[in-house]
Regions:
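Internal hydrophobic scaffold segments of catalytic domains
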Residues: 3-18, 47-48, 171, 177-189
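S-adenosyl-L-methionine-dependent methyltransferase catalytic module, highlighting the catalytic core
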Residues: 134-135, 139, 146-231
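Membrane-proximal basic amphipathic "stem/tether" segments
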Residues: 1-42, 224
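Acidic/glycine-enriched edge-of-secondary-structure segments
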Residues: 38-45, 94-96
Length: 231
């Protein structure tokens, strides 16, 4: 019986993959000793791939932001939208009294906020810090006016994000689809790839990746996932 032939290209690829994984494991082990595991100082928001992907998502739906808008603390996108003619009001929401919050309430149950109060809700990397996110998506649905829109991003892979009041969840597109299943229309997005996703716990910033790598999106292993959901 003849021995099966092995194509040189496949063999080289297998060897390269094995060597890469070996070297990566060594470098990650070394990183435990020399990596500072913190964000660069002087940036707000911090220039992470996740923040880049949030901007990419909001850019896609930029023209849909209108009417009475609310954003959850910190209001990174207030300057982007406030002052536009199509924006009639802009609230900032926090769970505790703070500046510049105009609404103080628990998103899981906010009876002081009326039904149909908003036309657009900006919820960027908030649900991961909410103990019962299904209650939050239900409340956002209640607070939206008919035809209103939630623009929501969540991490799929991320280091400890914001421990106050808690850091509870990471999400997939399937979990977002379930959380927003009561909305009339849902559009899901995923951003990032295994390189940017694995770089997150290493505190790698956008400048650590080439533009080609940063803007390559692999739905199997993204950094963040997002949803545009209409009432």
């Amino acid at each position: 019986m003849e021995r099966p032939s092995i194509q040189p290209v496949k063999l080289l690829k297998a060897i390269s993959s094995t060597l890469y994984k070996y070297l990566l494991g060594k470098f990650l082990g070394l990183g435990l000793q020399i990596n500072s595991f913190d964000f660069p100082e002087g940036y707000l928001p911090v220039p992470t791939p996740a923040r880049h992907y949030i901007d990419t998502f909001l850019n896609e739906f930029d023209s849909t932001v209108r009417g009475r808008v609310v954003e959850f603390m910190p209001p990174f996108y207030q300057e982007r939208y406030i002052g536009r003619s199509e924006i009639t009001s802009y609230d900032v929401w926090d769970v505790v009294p703070s500046t510049p919050a105009t609404i103080v309430a628990d998103l899981q149950s906010a009876p002081t906020v009326g039904e149909g109060s908003f036309d657009t809700i900006l919820c960027t990397h908030v649900l991961c810090n909410i103990q019962y996110p299904w209650l939050a998506t239900r409340e956002m649905h209640r607070m939206l006016d008919t035809g209103g829109l939630v623009l929501c991003t969540v991490p799929m892979i991320l280091q400890g994000y914001a421990p106050h009041p808690g850091d509870y969840y990471r999400f997939t597109t399937d979990s977002l689809r379930t959380l927003f299943e009561d909305y009339s229309k849902v559009e899901l997005r995923s951003y990032g790839n295994p390189a940017t996703a694995s770089g997150s716990p290493q505190y790698l910033m956008c400048n650590h990746f080439s533009s080609r790598v940063l803007n390559y999106h692999d739905p199997v292993c993204p950094s963040i996932v997002a949803v545009a959901a209409w009432k």
